[in-house]
Amino acid sequence: PVFYIYSLTMNGREQIGLVVCTSIDEYLNNTIKKHEFTRADKEQDRINHVDYCNANTGPIFLTYKNQKTIDQIISKEIEKAPIYDFISEDKVEHKVWLIDEDNVINDLVEQFKKVPSLYIADGHHRNASAVKVGLKRRGEGEYDKNAEFNYYLSVLFPADQLHIMDYNRLVKDLNGLTKEEFLDKIQENFTVTEVEGQYKPDAIHTFGMYLDKKWYKLQAKDSIIATDSVGCLDVSILQNSLLTPVLGIGDPRTDKRIDFVGGIRGLGELVKRVDSGEMTVAFAMYPTSMTQLMNIADDNKVMPPKSTWFEPKLRSGIFIHKLS
């Protein structure tokens, strides 16, 4: 076997991961932890793709709590010349190094035995689909525990290198309320202050709101901030104390009145869509942290939909893992 190192650099910030195959059993026994629900229709789409290609063509984005020795091994390996080095059309630099020395591979395997858990950062649907394809193939013919379908393609990144961006919300209407009624209602749970210019939240439990060509700062009142790992997330606070009770958004996964915009597109995208009349109000979020993500996964809980937006995205097609 060989490993690869995969580095992505975006806007001067680099993240360096190890490309490996991870075991479907470690997902099933919760050593590889999730923080999101998946949808059956999206899973099926990816199951069909993996089955038809007989391969994983896009890696799952996994993370782990930093281990100094692993960092040191990888730092030494990237002193060598990469086998790939290119800039994609989205201006992300991608570099790949090959690790084919047995002693280095064995060292990494031994060090990862000390890592208690891996966490899915991005790719919950692809991860669930890879596992289901493996289980399906186990049921067909004689089971071979070394067969490639028992494993799926992943890149493992140390948590301190990852960058979660804000994942912002747009709502089509004010649920039958006038602007004044809406502003009155939200002041029950939030301190509302009109601000000059765009407002990007700079601390947890604060939100930017764009309505009728004006920006507001919303500060959640202490009385609505829950103490559990999921309830205290800003996405939960906004959902439970504003989107559901005031705007009537029940299930954000299925409600057609809400849309989500990754922070990579900036606040200008929110302004554009509200000013065009397509949407009525926008909410700019403070990003979820890696610590929050891992705490929720460790508690065996799930985050609300659209809680995290990771950049840069891992590129499909650089690495391919054939299942047979």
Listing of model-derived features with the role each one plays in the protein:
Residues 1-324:
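Surface-exposed, charge/polar-rich loops and edge strands
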